[in-house]
A protein has these predicted regions:
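N-terminal amphipathic alpha-helix/helix-capping segment at the start of soluble metabolic enzymes
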Residues: 1-24, 71, 76
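Short amphipathic alpha-helices and their capping/turn segments at secondary-structure boundaries
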Residues: 1-4, 36-41, 70-77, 221-223
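Conserved, mostly hydrophobic/aromatic
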Residues: 11, 19, 40, 120, ...
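Terminal or standalone catalytic/regulatory effector modules within metabolic enzymes
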Residues: 35, 41-59, 282-292, 296-468
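Alpha-helical segments flanking ligand/cofactor-binding loops in enzyme cores
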Residues: 38, 108, 135, 166, ...
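Glycine-enriched alpha-helix->loop->beta-strand junction motifs that scaffold or abut catalytic
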Residues: 44, 114-116, 140-142, 170-174, ...
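Active-site beta->alpha loop and helix N-cap motifs at the rims of alpha/beta catalytic domains
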Residues: 52-169, 173-176, 182, 186
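Catalytic alpha/beta core domains of metabolic enzymes, predominantly
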Residues: 181-360
């Protein structure tokens, strides 16, 4: 088989964001990262994914860290490599829709504090939910990596994703990311999809997958043959070293320094061992589980699902919940399982199993999704489930959900005037009004560390609420 591209394959390393989100419930601290940042910067990666996703919430909720300060610290030590973040479209980094002015301000502050590339996705692939974030990222000089949330269903096929990619390119995307959060993209399908995308759009293609089902390495290799431009690797993703060694001496040789990778790996193995000893990194998430191809559960959802069941004392229901997830997903119109739909579907599945009766209880987020408040669901919602949730057909939202929201930023500035010390604080408070106030109060009443190179003593919040 011949490579369809002769350009070196570019690599984004995810150790600073997705690796610990998917395997350790997002509990890696900035002190865990600091000793390796300059080594990571020297390896030659295209970019480092270091921020966004669940890290923002977890910094304040569990680690007692300011997420904005984390970003500034990483930027200070990573001078040569692009930094990128994961951004949930109109949900920003939260779990509901925010007004356009809040989305705009968050993009502005993310770029101002050090982000170069914003990977923007919508859990439902509703492009209306990406419009503002794409516009704002370009407005403030960032690069837009618009995302296809990959999944498998009667609706989601190759033609669907090719059409979506073309639409995103026309909206201004600088790159297109295939976000295979549950490791469902099989090797031959990856070859076919990447080839079709390269024939349809002119912007670079970036592939993000996992190794949950054991196919990740093969998927990346076949994508490399098909001409993919950039791939994600790391701890939760397929191993960087394996791919670099595989392509060495070929036309797609990455040119990355395996020796420096080894130095970084030694450090992060020690961090992983500490997290495992503390019971935070559960060995279950390190195993290959081919049942993923049935359950379609992404890595980040898996580790937090385990955490949620532990807290409820229902660990024995783990596989029952996994089996319930695809049933709920079908009833909800086949949403891809990525934040926030993964949390919504996952929590509904947990409730269905724990309560002993399906749909006895509907969390408010489930009702909001069934009502269309998150956007248009890809497929047909089970009308019996929607009716059981108390939603009449005429109540379903059909417009862009954010069009129903009035500007909010000035309201938040006034509301948090006495507490917020900066616009960054205002945004933290706007997104996480239950978590950010106590974090900011605690932050502002403890002494600053001498320097970011000296580990600070921080209080760890104990919060029984799972961020699934």
């Amino acid at each position: 088989m011949e490579f369809l591209s002769n350009k070196p394959l570019l690599i984004t390393d995810t150790i600073l964001r997705d690796a610990h989100q998917s395997q350790a419930a997002t509990r890696m601290t900035i002190e865990d990262m600091l000793p390796a940042l300059e080594t990571l910067d020297s390896i030659g990666y295209y970019s480092l994914e270091c921020w966004g996703g669940a890290t923002f919430d977890a910094c304040m909720r569990f680690l007692g860290e300011d997420p904005w300060e984390r970003l500034r610290t990483i930027r200070k030590h990573v001078k040569n490599t692009k930094l990128q973040m994961l951004f949930r479209g109109q949900n920003i980094l939260g779990y509901k829709h925010y007004a356009d002015d809040v989305v705009d301000a968050f993009c502005a502050k993310s770029i101002e504090n050090g982000i170069d590339i914003i990977r923007i996705f919508d859990a439902l692939n509703d492009v209306r939910n990406l419009e503002q974030a794409i516009k704002s990222t370009k407005k403030y000089g960032g690069q837009v990596e618009a995302t296809l949330s990959y999944t498998m269903s009667p609706i989601h096929n190759e033609a669907y994703f090719v059409k979506l990619a073309k639409e995103l390119e026309e909206m201004g995307a600088d790159m297109i990311c295939i976000k295979d959060m549950a490791n469902l993209l099989l090797p031959m399908d990856a070859y076919s999809l990447v080839k079709a995308l390269k024939e349809t759009v002119s912007v670079p293609i970036h592939l993000h997958t996992h190794n949950t089902s054991g196919t990740g390495d093969m998927t990346l290799l076949m994508a490399a043959y098909a001409g993919v431009d950039i791939v994600d690797t790391g701890t939760s993703q397929p191993a960087t070293e394996s791919l670099v060694a595989t392509l060495k001496g070929t036309v797609r040789d990455t040119g990355l320094d395996l020796g420096k990778m080894s130095d970084a790996a030694v450090h992060f193995r020690q961090v992983a061992q500490r997290l495992q000893d503390a019971g935070i990194l559960d060995p279950k998430v390190l195993r290959v589980d081919t049942n993923t191809l049935l359950y379609q559960v992404p890595g980040g959802m898996l580790s937090n699902l385990i955490s949620q069941l532990k807290q409820a004392g229902k660990e024995d229901k783990y596989y029952d919940v996994l089996a319930e997830i695809p049933r709920v997903r079908k009833d909800f119109g086949y949403p891809p399982l990525v934040t926030p739909s993964s949390q919504i579907v996952g929590t509904q599945a947990v409730m269905n199993i724990i309560m002993g009766e399906r749909y006895k209880v509907f969390p408010k987020e489930s009702k909001a999704m069934l009502k269309g408040e998150y956007g248009q669901l890809p497929g047909q919602v089970n009308p019996e489930v929607r009716a059981k949730a108390g939603i009449a057909p005429e109540d379903v939202v059909t417009c862009r959900p954010a069009d129903l929201l009035e500007p909010e930023l000035e309201k938040y500035r006034q509301e948090f005037r006495g507490l917020a010390k900066s616009d960054e604080d205002v945004l933290s408070l706007a997104l996480f009004p239950q978590v950010a106030p106590k974090f900011i109060e605690k932050r502002d009443h403890q002494p600053e560390p001498v320097s970011d190179d000296a580990p600070a003593v921080r209080e760890l919040y104990v919060d029984a609420k799972s961020i699934l």
